[in-house]
C-alpha cells in the first residue's frame, strides 16, 4: 500500500549504464554476482532515518525548508513517518535501515514516557519489517540533541545525566535486539569538551570507559549477537571529541579492556574532519582488528565542516571498498548512507534520486575494487615490497630474538649498507586509474 508521498513512482530497478532515467540504477544491480556473491550481499546498503525523515532542512542561518506531513511530535505522525520510510526503503530495494530512538518516537515528558513511545513504535517497526523484508542494520540512542546532554552523556559532570543516558542506551539496545538489529552503534557527539578550563579529562575518561563496559555487559546479558560499534569523529558539535579517529578509539578500548569486544563504524566525512582519507581509517581499523561497518558520505573539501553529502567520487569509494574486500568484506556491518539532501532539494523525488546516485557510485567503486582484487597487481606489489621481512634474520628481529647489541654486531660483521628503493607511487597511482 502506497502512502502517496512519492506519487506514482514504482520500484527502482537496474536499467544499465546507458539509461537516462533518473529513477533507475545504472550501475547497481543487486543480483549481479561479483567475487562469488550478489552485489546486494556485498554492499549491504542501509538507509538512515534521521537525515531523510527528521532533518527539517535548516542551517545556522535559516530554518525549515522541507514540508513533510509527519513533522509533528505525535505517535500518529511517527507511524506516518514509518509508513513513508519503509515505502522508500522498498522503492530503493534498500535491504537495511538505521535509526536513533529520537528519530522514530515522539519526545516524552520523562524517561518512562520515552520508553513507552519507543516500545510502541518498535511494535510498528516489527510489523513493517515483516511486511517488507527490510532489516535493521543498527540502532542507536540520540544522546546529543536534548539540552540535558549539552555537557555530554557518559562524560557529563552530573551523575544523573550519566544515569539517564545509561537507561536510554538500555532501552535502545532492547529495541535493536528485538528488531533483529545486526549491530548497535554509539556516537559521542557531546563526549568531549568545549574548554579545558572546566574539564577533568581523567574523570571523563573513567566515566566513558565504565559506560562502554556496561554496554558490553548488557549485550551479553540479553544475548545480543550483533557487534557493538563506536563511531569516531574529531569534533562537531563538540570542540574536541574523545573518539577522535580509529587509532584514538583503539587506545581507549585497549585502556579499558574492550579491544576484543568493540569495533568501529567509520564515516568518510568524519575521517576527512580528522585530516585522514577514508581508506586510511578503514585500513587502520583493519590493521587493529576493529573494523565493523561504514557510513558512506562525503564532505565539501572547501567548507571545513561535516556536510554529509552523498558520495560522488568513484576513485575514493573504490579505495575504501578495496580495503574492505581485502580483509574479507563486511560481516555484521554494511554501507549506511549517513547523508542528507541539500536544503534546496525539497521534492520527494530528490530523496530517491540522491540514494540512487549514491548506490550507483558505490556499485561502480565496488566493482573497481573487486577488479583490483582479482587482478592482484597492487597486492603483489605490497607483498614484494616487504618480502625482505620473510627472511630468517628479519623474522628474528621482529620476534624479539635479537637485541640492539646483536643487531649492531651483525650490521658491522656483514657490512650491511642498504640502498634506497623506489616506492613507485606514480606507477601505483596509474595502476589504480586503470580500474576507476
UniProtKB/Swiss-Prot annotation:
Lipid biosynthesis recorded as keyword: no
InterPro entries per the UniProt record, alphabetical: Xyl_isomerase-like_sf (IPR036237), Xylose_isom_bac (IPR013452), Xylose_isomerase (IPR001998)
EC number: 5.3.1.5
UniProt keyword Cytoplasm present: yes
GO cellular component: cytoplasm
Binding site for Mg(2+) 1: 231, 267, 295, 338
An annotated GO BP: D-xylose metabolic process
Cofactor: Mg(2+)
Origin superkingdom: Bacteria
Keywords, alphabetical: Carbohydrate metabolism, Cytoplasm, Isomerase, Magnesium, Metal-binding, Xylose metabolism
Cellular localisation: Cytoplasm
Record GO terms (molecular function): magnesium ion binding; xylose isomerase activity
Active site residues according to the UniProt entry: 100, 103
Catalytic activity reported: alpha-D-xylose = alpha-D-xylulofuranose
UniProt binding sites for Mg(2+) 2: 267, 270, 306, 308
Cofactor note: Binds 2 magnesium ions per subunit.
PROSITE patterns assigned: XYLOSE_ISOMERASE
Subunit-structure text: Homotetramer.
Family recorded in the similarity comment: Belongs to the xylose isomerase family.
Protein name stated in the entry: Xylose isomerase
Organism: Ruegeria sp. (strain TM1040) (Silicibacter sp.)
Classification of source organism: Bacteria, Pseudomonadati, Pseudomonadota, Alphaproteobacteria, Rhodobacterales
Amino acid at each position: 500500500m502506497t502512502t502517496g508521498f512519492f506519487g506514482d513512482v514504482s520500484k527502482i530497478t537496474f536499467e544499465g549504464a546507458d539509461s537516462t532515467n533518473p529513477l533507475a540504477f545504472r550501475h547497481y544491480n543487486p543480483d549481479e554476482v561479483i567475487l562469488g556473491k550478489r552485489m546486494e550481499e556485498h554492499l549491504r546498503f542501509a538507509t538512515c532515518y534521521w537525515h531523510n525523515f527528521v532533518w527539517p532542512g535548516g542551517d545556522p542561518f535559516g530554518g525549515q525548508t522541507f514540508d513533510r506531513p509527519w513533522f509533528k511530535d505525535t505517535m500518529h505522525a511517527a507511524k506516518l513517518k514509518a509508513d513513508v520510510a519503509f515505502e522508500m526503503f522498498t522503492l530503493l530495494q534498500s535491504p537495511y535501515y538505521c535509526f536513533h530512538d529520537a528519530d522514530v518516537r515522539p519526545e516524552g515528558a520523562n524517561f518512562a514516557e520515552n520508553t513507552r513511545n519507543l516500545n510502541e513504535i518498535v511494535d510498528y517497526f516489527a510489523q513493517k519489517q515483516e511486511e517488507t523484508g527490510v532489516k535493521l542494520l543498527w540502532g542507536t540512542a540520540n544522546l546529543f540533541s536534548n539540552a540535558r546532554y549539552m555537557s555530554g552523556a557518559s562524560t557529563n559532570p552530573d551523575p544523573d545525566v550519566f544515569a539517564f543516558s545509561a537507561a536510554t542506551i538500555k532501552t535502545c539496545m532492547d529495541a535493536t535486539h528485538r528488531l533483529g538489529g545486526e549491530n548497535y552503534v554509539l556516537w559521542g557527539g557531546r563526549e568531549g569538551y568545549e574548554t579545558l578550563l572546566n574539564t577533568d579529562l581523567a574523570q571523563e575518561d573513567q566515566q566513558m570507559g565504565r559506560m562502554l563496559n556496561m554496554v558490553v555487559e548488557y549485550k551479553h546479558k540479553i544475548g545480543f549477537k550483533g557487534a557493538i560499534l563506536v563511531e569516531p569523529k574529531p569534533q562537531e558539535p563538540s570542540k574536541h571529541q574523545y573518539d577522535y579517529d580509529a587509532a584514538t578509539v583503539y587506545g581507549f578500548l585497549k585502556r579499558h579492556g574492550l579491544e576484543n569486544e568493540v569495533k568501529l563504524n567509520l564515516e568518510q566525512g568524519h575521517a576527512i574532519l580528522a585530516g585522514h582519507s577514508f581508506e586510511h581509517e578503514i585500513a587502520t581499523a583493519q590493521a587493529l582488528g576493529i573494523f565493523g561497518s561504514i557510513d558512506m558520505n562525503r564532505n565539501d573539501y572547501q567548507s571545513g565542516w561535516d556536510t554529509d553529502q552523498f558520495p560522488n567520487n568513484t576513485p575514493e569509494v573504490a579505495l575504501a571498498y578495496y580495503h574492505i574486500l581485502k580483509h574479507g568484506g563486511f560481516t555484521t556491518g554494511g554501507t549506511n548512507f549517513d547523508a542528507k539532501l541539500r536544503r534546496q532539494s525539497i521534492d520527494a523525488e530528490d530523496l530517491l534520486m540522491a540514494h540512487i546516485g549514491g548506490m550507483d557510485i558505490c556499485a561502480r567503486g565496488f566493482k573497481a575494487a573487486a577488479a583490483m582484487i582479482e587482478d592482484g597487481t597492487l597486492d603483489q606489489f605490497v607483498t614484494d615490497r616487504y618480502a625482505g621481512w620473510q627472511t630468517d634474520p628479519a623474522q628474528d628481529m621482529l620476534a624479539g630474538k635479537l637485541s640492539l647489541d646483536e643487531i649492531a654486531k651483525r650490521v658491522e660483521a656483514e657490512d650491511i649498507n642498504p640502498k634506497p628503493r623506489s616506492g613507485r607511487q606514480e606507477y601505483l597511482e596509474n595502476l589504480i586509474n586503470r580500474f576507476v
